Amino acid sequence: MSDAQDSRVGSMFGPYHLKRLLGRGGMGEVYEAEHTVKEWTVAVKLMTAEFSKDPVFRERMKREARIAGRLQEPHVVPIHDYGEVDGQMFLEMRLVEGTDLDSVLKRFGPLTPPRAVAIITQIASALDAAHADGVMHRDVKPQNILITRDDFAYLVDFGIASATTDEKLTQLGTAVGTWKYMAPERFSNDEVTYRADIYALACVLHECLTGAPPYRADSAGTLVSSHLMGPIPQPSAIRPGIPKAFDAVVARGMAKKPEDRYASAGDLALAAHEALSDPDQDHAADILRRSQESTLPAPPKPVPPPTMPATAMAPRQPPAPPVTPPGVQPAPKPSYTPPAQPGPAGQRPGPTGQPSWAPNSGPMPASGPTPTPQYYQGGGWGAPPSGGPSPWAQTPRKTNPWPLVAGAAAVVLVLVLGAIGIWIAIRPKPVQPPQPVAEERLSALLLNSSEVNAVMGSSSMQPGKPITSMDSSPVTVSLPDCQGALYTSQDPVYAGTGYTAINGLISSEPGDNYEHWVNQAVVAFPTADKARAFVQTSADKWKNCAGKTVTVTNKAKTYRWTFADVKGSPPTITVIDTQEGAEGWECQRAMSVANNVVVDVNACGYRITNQAGQIAAKIVDKVNKE
């Protein structure tokens, strides 16, 4: 039976009139559809019965779709809505005119280096925006990259890959195609971070330059072995004419250890841009400029002015020595009662109403999709049906104008983000990074007494002696990897990281009955990359401690601390620790990084909210002014 005969073209699915089958794969089908209630044309993905009935997949898909729907970046094809009709799960997405990068490479072969860099730069912009919002893609590959005729690139299928287990993909026979781009840590029990997306992007860069993925094999086992232990291929050795500088770019992007990779997708894209010759850098800039100008909407005409005027974690006793981690029983609680802690950041109420056709439908983030070209293809959903129209075919559609204010705001947002992306890519010579902060400047970065008192809500906190070495106190933590989430500047935490110097201060009110305690430290590393890598590693360990209780043994005394959820992601992370049986005594840990300096702060008291985060931010500001 042909694709056309076996499709649901012409039928209704809830409020959607399915007009054209765009693609088919192991997870389901993609249709061009008209939303008959809201009168716009979209892409609708219908999941197979196997996936729709899988409770794990259903919950993951809903969660990831809600997160991915928040992304507002020109190179991201957003999810507008999700839900189910008669037990079948679906996703509604913007319809985009384009063909997937995999088809382009198979039909035309490798891209020129400038064109490859232009496309990687756009996808890096999408990934960095997602990572900043705490969203990982997990399935970056040519099939999930759409290219328009003017080389404007989109990254699709946010949330789908992460909703699907690798075992499920294996059962569907699609794992080998996906595993060509999987980072080594995805084949182990190690935590998978956003740097897995950077690894995959480096694999895509390799394929754009050479026409082939880095590793090719007939079995998933061979692919896994190559990613884990195989040498990283050199594009210049595979295809003559590729600048040798790309070998180093791909090697770092595909580093076996996540901490050895680029700190962001944008860093990888910038390195790829710098690997081009000067004429090719200009060519890549021209491609980016042309794609932006042809795809992003023009600014709205100015509105005439109105004719009428507008209507108007520390112990409660000082540690001995001063750098001893917190652990001593605090003094009695003050007479006031601490206020309730605020709810988790980003918590959103559920939808207030849902149409009868989709009882579990997800919230719509906006009143309708941003008007865009009308063809969607790819996303790992298989090739278009045989005999279908040209991928550049235009299909008339009904329009539903956006309100003027919302439209103008969207246009401004897209233009600003687009302009930033162009500027980064087309500058002829990159701005030189700042010189590393010298060790003798570390003490000047710490907050003085008045600054610490202002943040902590005190008036009498005073600093102790300067700290110039890591704390090596004989402290035992039941979960050793959580020691850094509990205490500042710990020798076991920093040992072997390559740091070069530390400077810190402990501040509190005089005497034994202090109500506030702060340990602030700044740690110098040889390079900014090493400092960022340390913070990323710390973030991974802290997240593994969230919700857990640890037992601390310090000088023959035992204490128990419970970790809340970690907030933020590198470059800044925070977590609150509560001491058991200490009448509300809490500490907030904060860690951040600027240039080659790691900022390490612990702020303790009875009314802890984000004091450590504020202190860290103020220190970062000082580092950036150096």
From Swiss-Prot:
Q: Which GO terms describe its molecular function?
A: ATP binding; protein kinase activity; protein serine kinase activity; protein serine/threonine kinase activity
* Pfam families to which the protein is assigned, alphabetical: Pkinase, PknH_C
Tell me what effect the entry lists for T170A.
Answer: Abolished autophosphorylation
Q: Where is the Protein kinase domain?
A: 16-276
* Disulfide-linked positions: C482-C545, C587-C604
The membrane-spanning stretches of this chain are 404-424
Q: What residues form the catalytic site here? A: D139
- Induction of synthesis: Repressed by low pH and heat shock. Up-regulated inside the host macrophages.
Topology Extracellular: residue spans: 425-626
Posttranslational modification = Autophosphorylated on threonine and serine residues. Dephosphorylated by PstP.
InterPro entries, A to Z: Kinase-like_dom_sf, PknH-like_Extracell, PknH-like_Extracell_sf, Prot_kinase_dom, Protein_kinase_ATP_BS, Ser/Thr_kinase_AS
Tell me which GO cellular component terms the UniProt record holds: peptidoglycan-based cell wall; plasma membrane
Look up the record and name the cofactor or cofactors this protein needs: a divalent metal cation
Residue ranges of region Disordered? 292-396
Return the EC number: 2.7.11.1
Q: Which UniProt keywords apply?
A: ATP-binding, Cell membrane, Disulfide bond, Kinase, Membrane, Nucleotide-binding, Phosphoprotein, Serine/threonine-protein kinase, Stress response, Transferase, Transmembrane, Transmembrane helix
Q: Which reaction does it catalyse?
A: L-seryl-[protein] + ATP = O-phospho-L-seryl-[protein] + ADP + H(+); L-threonyl-[protein] + ATP = O-phospho-L-threonyl-[protein] + ADP + H(+)
State the membrane topology: Single-pass membrane protein
So which stretches are on the Cytoplasmic side?
1-403
- The residues that hold ATP are L22, G23, R24, G25, G26, M27, G28, E29, V30, K45
Q: Where is the composition biased (Low complexity)?
A: 343-355
Q: What is the documented function of this protein? A: May regulate bacterial growth in response to external signals to facilitate adaptation to the host environment. In vitro, phosphorylates several substrates such as EmbR, DevR (DosR), DacB1 and Rv0681.
The entry assigns this protein to a family as follows: Belongs to the protein kinase superfamily. Ser/Thr protein kinase family.
Instruction: Give the matching PANTHER family.
Output: MITOGEN-ACTIVATED PROTEIN KINASE KINASE KINASE 20-RELATED, SERINE_THREONINE-PROTEIN KINASE NEKL-3
User: This protein is called what?
Assistant: Serine/threonine-protein kinase PknH
Organism of this sequence: Mycobacterium tuberculosis (strain ATCC 25618 / H37Rv)
* This protein's encoding gene: pknH
